[in-house]
């Protein structure tokens, strides 16, 4: 497999991002591309709380950091705080990634590193989302 880290997201397109970056990273997560996620862990009827927010671009710009790791952490935190406010425990996050087409795969992967680290710190995972 060739190195794709310097490609821009706009060069790959949504399907290319799913196949090249997201599916290999989240092993078998089918939720990318249909804006939803299947949570196999939910076996019995129960109250389920769902939320999804993207990280506001102006807020990310205020971080003034070229590394998107912290923006990824913030993106996960925004969604986890919505669940906490509802008194819910997270089973997984359905995350919206709103990024310019000029973002490189390497930058996107750093954002994903931040999302994953925040999820791990709170005992959850990325279940799917939208690009």
Describe the predicted segments one by one.
Residues 1-67, 95, 110, 114-123:
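Extreme N-terminal cap/leader segments of soluble proteins
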Residues 68-131:
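A glycine-rich phosphate/pyrophosphate-binding beta-strand-loop-alpha-helix module
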